[in-house]
Amino acid sequence: MEQVPSAGRLVQITVTEGYDLKGFKGDTPVTFIRAEFNQVVLGDSAKITVSPEGSAKYNFTSSFEFNPEGGITSDDLAHKPVFLTVTEVLPKEKKQKEEKTLILGQAVVDLLPLLEGQSSFQTTVPLHPVQGSPLETPRSSAKQCSLEVKVLVAEPLLTTAQISGGNLLKVTLEAAYSVPESFIPTGPGQNYMVGLQVPSLGEKDYPILFKNGTLKLGGEREPVPRPKKWPIANILAPGANNIPDAFIVGGPYEEEEGELNHPEDSEFRNQAECIKKRIIWDLESRCYLDPSAVVSFQKRIADCRLWPVEITRVPLVTIPKGKAGKTEKTDEEAQLSFHGVAYVNMVPLLYPGVKRIRGAFHVYPYLDSVVHEKTKCLLSLFRDIGHHLIHNNKIGGINSLLSKQAVSKNLKEDKPVKEKDIDGRPRPGDVQAPSIKSQSSDTPLEGEPPLSHNPEGQQYVEAGTYIVLEIQLDKALVPKRMPEELARRVKEMIPPRPPLTRRTGGAQKAMSDYHIQIKNISRAILDEYYRMFGKQVAKLESDMDSETLEEQKCQLSYELNCSGKYFAFKEQLKHAVVKIVRDKYLKTTSFESQEELQTFISELYVFLVDQMHVALNQTMPDDVQGTVATIYTSSEQLQLFAFEAEVNENFEMAAAYYKERLVREPQNLDHWLDYGAFCLLTEDNIKAQECFQKALSLNQSHIHSLLLCGVLAVLLENYEQAEIFFEDATCLEPTNVVAWTLLGLYYEIQNNDIRMEMAFHEASKQLQARMLQAQVTKQKSTGVEDTEERGKRESSLGPWGITNGSATAIKVEAPAGPGAALSILDKFLEESSKLQSDSQEPILTTQTWDPSISQKPSNTFIKEIPTKKEASKCQDSSALLHPGLHYGVSQTTTIFMETIHFLMKVKAVQYVHRVLAHELLCPQGGPSCEYYLVLAQTHILKKNFAKAEEYLQQAAQMDYLNPNVWGLKGHLYFLSGNHSEAKACYERTISFVVDASEMHFIFLRLGLIYLEEKEYEKAKKTYMQACKRSPSCLTWLGLGIACYRLEELTEAEDALSEANALNNYNAEVWAYLALVCLKVGRQLEAEQAYKYMIKLKLKDEALLAEIHTLQETVGFGNPSF
């Protein structure tokens, strides 16, 4: 890295002109300018007479030497401005030996641009009047009272590497609120101080001090925005205290990073900031961090996490007569009191892109052991570093090895009001002053409180004292990827799919040509037929029998062959058939075997015959036969059928339904996501990844596609891609709770605790904001809500907080496989349940269900049959292998339960175990009814019914009236073969006022149990409810069976016909149709239904035997008789 030359460089400050000036003795006073920097006078200008217009050309240049190795450093330039004081020289009176001067005003020049790489800059700075100055009343001219200033250095003070690698730290101390009652504004003066240490040059720590806070009584809130002030003493003009363009703007408590940003804290903070006593500083101190200090700062934050910010007060004692007007505390009299500390969590500064944290932080008594345990800090800034920090403006770094004589601390203080802000900034190379503690003994000096007990500091806790602090960096310590970069990376990994172009000369054209040739040939054959048999046809008309027609057919065929027309017709079709082979079947190469050739020819023949019939029907429609209405199944119905097939473990049929949806609408990304979720369920991760990537290629801004691509990338251990997908999702939708949570889980896998905490914190923040907004919306719609309930809800909305212990536990106990993780969760739950049972009894609670806040249940069809489309939208892609429950978000939820809902909805069961571990350890989560339901569902998927039953018992203890619990218990008993218990659970579920989240299979399975137990009336009612909610082949089949057993044959046939229309590949439907037709005596239909049943291979032997028995009874129905 480039090094700054050791020789000092000159910084020149030139005041060229002043505007709108006037004096005490008139509008054309004689004035001069004094330049000061770092409490050193740089020089005085010549005495210039102000023009009648108020301007004065000073052309005054002063300078100081910048030398980072000793003297004025980058840190000095960062937080110390140049003061330009304009003084009027009054005319000499008689017998007056010296000229009398009066100060008119003071201007402040900020040198910060020199640390940003500029070698010169020009600015117009306002001239702030002192009290009583004539400048308080401006002239009538439009120009403001100001000075024109130029700052120049021969070359940039910092190298390119220092500018790019360094940083600027700004610390703003606003106030301490709700201070102890023992703080009173009357009596001896007190210096209220706050301090912290930061690395400034390499590993050396430098203290930042804020002194002389103003104790104020309560009564009104501090105004915002209000200006930030320089941490410099003895500023003459009140307006010069304010840092240009720097303001305290405040903001909502919920957006702060501190400890008092929860909804339940708002009432206390409102009282503290309006009514109670407070100490006001409003100071901003700036510190330049060189590149090595930036690295040290990052490392210190990562290692310590919490930063100690100390607060104390020291009495100000008036110096005896002869030094009137000065208040200063001598070393002998110095005594720290009310020594407290606030622990500031600096970790958010290591979050990508974060440059600022602001918040309120509790003040605790300063105890060495506690401070060291929390922050790893061994020294107290006020007690161990020494009293020179209280008075001196120039102090050496704590770890500095350089030594120079300390500069005298006797500062000019004209009035007590001007003692407000003593600069506490260090200078490299200065010596450490002795500490209060004796250098030769570990025994505290007299008056120093014991290190293990701090009764005065305890008053901060009793009063609820907190400080409001802001820490800001010029550049983020950890850069954040820009959204454009993330979008580019996603585009590189998954190129967007271009829209399909229509080909005019492809398969469609080949089909059209074939149809045209068929029509032409058919007309030619008809012409030949009428030529040969026209008179005979006209004579016989409709009396022609089949033998005559067969004879005419043979004669026509013979004539076509003999005349060569048959050969001509074949040649005419040949070109069209070749185009179909090439464009439709994409066959352009020879076949590898004779068997393959024969198979293809057979397939082609069937296709050509079908298309010939299509063409002939278009040319010669059958006027006698009426048009048959085609039954079209919608995409939503296909999704329901696929769900039923999944639950019944007929994965081949489910895949067929999903693929049919894709064939119909290949550009619909939801269809790709549903098929990908199905592949996740069957653990075909490669196929699932392909589906999700295809969905993302259709819309690269689709959040769910990005998240699912990220989940699959994690499962397939493509971690770099996973980070890109998750980050892009959070950039596209910063309010998405699931996106932030999944990003945090990814960082956990990468052992990046800080970023994990960042993502979880942001997820919790977004969830809290959403729930608060929902509460506001509810209040507006329903009126005033109960105060007690509102308080309970607010207290449960605290942000997710991670502890080191919980993070470690999860990392240790989350192996790669879901099965291993679930076994560990089982053990953990057993231990936690034992502890819980020791402390309290199980509580039976009634789960409140608020539709204004809860999401709609996923698989519940609540509309009538005509509104199938709306009803089907409720399904989304939320099927599980077994009829799982998809829980709506209750009023109080966690970021992890939200993520579990998403993962279960898309069937990413392999990923759920990671989130369950966090939900168990989350302060707002833990073993809840909903948690046990999800855990039971995962065990049902593994067919571990004993564990699932155990967790369902736990869920029932926590919420006995939850319909989801009883519904899942019913499924558990049904799958394990205990149909009597399943029946009881299902009946209890449907008896609740509120439906379970998934009712479709509850009705189906309950109806099946009724059929088994020959309770046909109950089965009929149950299946009718299912048909009304979500009609499918299975619901109509169940209704048809129930009606058949009740001898209601007409209703049975109608229901079975509906079932057949929705799925004509169900052998059981054909079987019952055959039974109905046998009963009503329709032989042809009975034989046809029986034929299809045999073709589809009915597996129910008892039903097959029943059909054979009935066939023998009626004497027909089996073509083999």
Swiss-Prot record:
Keywords: Cell projection, Cilium, Cytoplasm, Cytoskeleton, Disease variant, Flagellum, Repeat, TPR repeat
Residue intervals passing through the bilayer: none
Subcellular compartments: Cell projection, Cilium, Flagellum; Cytoplasm, Cytoskeleton, Flagellum basal body; Cell projection, Cilium; Cytoplasm, Cytoskeleton, Cilium axoneme
InterPro entries, sorted: CFAP70, TPR-like_helical_dom_sf, TPR_rpt
Tissue: Expressed in testis.
Family, as annotated: Belongs to the CFAP70 family.
One Pfam short name: TPR_8
Region annotated Disordered, chain positions: 410-457, 778-802, 836-858
GO cellular component, one term: sperm flagellum
Origin: domain of life: Eukaryota
Note on domains (UniProt): The conserved TPR domains are dispensable for ciliary targeting. The N-terminal half is important for cilary localization and/or binding to the axoneme.
Disease in which the protein is involved: Spermatogenic failure 41: An autosomal recessive infertility disorder characterized by oligozoospermia, severe asthenozoospermia and flagellar abnormalities such as short, absent, coiled, and irregular-caliber flagella. Some sperm show tapered heads and acrosomal abnormalities.
GO biological process: cilium assembly; cilium movement
Cited function: Axoneme-binding protein that plays a role in the regulation of ciliary motility and cilium length.
Bias kind Basic and acidic residues: ranges: 410-428
Protein name according to UniProt: Cilia- and flagella-associated protein 70
Coiled-coil regions listed: none
Organism whose genome encodes this protein: Homo sapiens (Human)
TPR repeats: 635-668, 669-702, 704-736, 929-962, 963-996, 1000-1033, 1035-1066, 1068-1100
